[in-house]
Design a protein with these regions (language model features):
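Formylglycine-dependent sulfatase
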Residues: 2-214
């Protein structure tokens, strides 16, 4: 469903703007180093220091999947259709990266999608979604480490429609995929990268190097 708004003013040409959108999962406002000295999050702290920190921002729905759909559509859950952690998006939804594609952007999604669990009988939950030229994801919550599933197979990631085994700690692996995308993409087009981490969603497992940090 397209909801249009009139442009308010002229902006810098789209070809001059590259965007990296990073989402962490289930991370409270006080689980950030610049908000709580007990916590060590140097990279997020740097983003806050060099960017803007919105101190009074709220989500419209306190659930994972509806919030993810709102980010991509700009709509309330009763409009985009993702009313819980199982419902799929309405088929007529337009995700904002689709508009970026129309404007000449190269777009990529890397990480946790987690929308449409109820549609698992008709499609793979990690299938590439509209609006993205490059795709890396996994079904549902995913796994922090390579895990043997109930069918006896090891869990996999969907990389542009091809299923490959997860190799290591998921935060590091998703970050590596993002770095690879940025280093290999053509510089002739602007890009939008949506890096959607699984961490620090419960049940949280740290990387081995951080296992005894606290």
């Amino acid at each position: 469903k397209e909801l249009r708004a009139e442009p308010q003013n002229d902006v810098t040409a789209a070809s001059d703007i590259n965007v990296i959108y990073i989402l962490t999962d289930d991370q409270r406002f006080d689980e950030l180093g610049f908000m709580n000295p007990v916590i060590d999050t140097p990279n997020i702290d740097r983003l806050a220091q060099e960017g803007v920190h919105f101190k009074n921002a709220f989500v419209t729905t306190a659930l994972c999947s509806p919030s993810r759909a709102t980010i991509l559509t700009g709509q309330y859950m009763h409009n985009h259709g993702v009313v819980d952690n199982n419902a799929p998006p309405n088929p007529d939804n337009v995700f904002f990266p689709q508009y970026l594609q129309r404007g000449g952007y190269d777009t990529a999604f890397i990480g946790k999608w987690h929308m449409g669990e109820a549609a698992s009988a008709t499609r793979n939950l990690d299938d590439p979604q509209p609006g993205f030229d490059h795709w890396v994801s996994f079904a549902g919550q995913g796994h922090y480490y390579p895990t043997k599933l109930r069918n006896g197979e090891m869990n996999k990631l969907n990389v542009n429609g091809e299923h490959v085994f997860q190799k290591g700690y998921i935060t590091d692996e998703l970050t590596d995929y993002a770095i690879d995308y940025l280093s290999q993409r053509s510089s002739e087009r602007p890009f939008f990268l949506y890096l959607s981490h699984k961490a620090v969603h419960t049940n949280f497992s740290p990387a081995a190097r951080h296992a005894t940090q606290y």
